[in-house]
Amino acid sequence: DTRVRDPRLWYAPWLTPGTHASMAGLATSGTLTHWFRDQFARDLPKADAFPTLAAEAAESPKGANGLLLLPYFSGERTPIHDTNAKGAFFGLNLTHTRGDMYRALIEGIAYGTNHVTRTYADLNQPPTRLLAVGGGTKNQLWLQATSDITGIDQIVCEKTVGASYGN
């Protein structure tokens, strides 16, 4: 077993005996976008909410006009494994728009993904590509922010319903 053991990751048996998969994941990516929609976009029909929020976020510059978000709204898994970690908006003021807030949310999740990729790089296993699945694949701004922040190209899987389907 040549597995690299690191407490920031978790491991599981893989497809053939003696192999394993090292795994990582954020606690609240998609859930956080749904929370934001439900709290701050009640004026929008649900079917239009995410495209409208993405369009508003696209009007905000990179860095969301100085607004930052820590995406730990339900604790965090990789790499800090802290169920008590808390999320927060930093730098919020009266000039910020809903678009700034949503862009900060997207960028905060992307920085969380970057934290994961740096964990693998610390272990001399830097990712060379990211596989994108789930609802976020419909948000071009989210995909681009993740690629820009991590410096890693993404592949959007053909079936993007979610990681639980093994895609």
Q: Predicted regions: what is each one?
A:
Residues 1-166:
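Active-site core segments that coordinate phosphate-bearing ligands/cofactors
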